[in-house]
């Protein structure tokens, strides 16, 4: 494929934008470098770049585009919002409609509040949990990404009984020491951390199904035990459902798994492609939020008509009968096709697939936590990513990210993708 215009534009972007991109994940650093492809437009399941190349897209903007690009129902809603004014700074009736839709889909959301992003939603749930419990520390799980605010840019110390250390320049040591990080799916480490820091722990922050070191499900009984132990300790449980809400069913991963948190943060899908976040939970906890309570949260663009109407339209599309069964069918087809191609060419892969989301790890071992994901072969993934791009398949540029199937993907797209995987695996073996 010709990428000359993408290269030209990236060179120009480097002169004006830090690193040439507005989010580090777009830089291709995670696949060994190379020029990121600049897209011109997107429609349905397809991307079209500035050089005229067409791709089947599984990036889905890192998750929000579950209905495919430029879905006509969502486009119509956004157009209507633009015509009537995109920002008021006042309440609108649409906020009520959307809040009711979220509550009906995810019953643990007894009250909700809208924000501008998933990062803001998670950040605020922690503040609210602290206000409710009168405690300061949180426990989170290694490798789970919860946004780019200071408190969650923290990595583990030397063990569950030690405090966190900054995972980014600019995060203070004192901030990091408010966080204890333990391995996902490791109940013994969680118990140890809770025992050591017991009456200081305000909340446990967890992705119920991990989406940020690939798709990783909780082991049987893990989330139930986290709930039981946290509540016995007087701590709240916060689910970060920024990736998972409406991903596996019409509702949250909490509905899908049957384990209910005290607070939930959401984003991505619920905006239909526009910036949005939301959080909610038990009434007694949510009443700590201003103007009813002392925990302050506000936003100029929070609940803006454009994002709200886009979100309403997205959820309306997701109510299509049989949609999530189709996601499951196509996800299973991809997993099976990738595994068969890998076996054919003698390449070791592990595919974690949950409904319409999956991750391909270059390893023969199971992946159940961040350490195991980190041990997979990133060099092979980088070659695979670049090979798939040349075959017209757009993936996320990191071994830690997921493939997302959208409502716009067809069975023909899935079969074409499996053929591309077979071709790329063959070339990878040949190149060795």
UniProtKB/Swiss-Prot annotation:
Q: Name one GO cellular component term.
A: cytoplasm
User: What is the required cofactor set for this protein?
Assistant: pyridoxal 5'-phosphate
Q: What is its main location?
A: cytoplasm
Please identify the protein, giving its name as recorded: Glutamate-1-semialdehyde 2,1-aminomutase 1
What terms describe the molecular function in GO for this protein? glutamate-1-semialdehyde 2,1-aminomutase activity; pyridoxal phosphate binding; transaminase activity
Gene behind this protein: hemL1
Chemical reaction(s) catalysed: (S)-4-amino-5-oxopentanoate = 5-aminolevulinate
Specify the pathway.
Answer: Porphyrin-containing compound metabolism; protoporphyrin-IX biosynthesis; 5-aminolevulinate from L-glutamyl-tRNA(Glu): step 2/2
CDD domains cross-referenced by the UniProt entry: OAT_like
- PANTHER family referenced in this protein's UniProt entry, alphabetically: GLUTAMATE-1-SEMIALDEHYDE 2,1-AMINOMUTASE, GLUTAMATE-1-SEMIALDEHYDE 2,1-AMINOMUTASE 2
Q: Which family would the database say this protein is a member of?
A: Belongs to the class-III pyridoxal-phosphate-dependent aminotransferase family. HemL subfamily.
Residues annotated as carrying N6-(pyridoxal phosphate)lysine in the record are 268
Source organism (scientific name): Listeria monocytogenes serotype 4a (strain HCC23)
| Gene Ontology BP, a term | protoporphyrinogen IX biosynthetic process
Which cysteines bridge via disulfide bonds? none
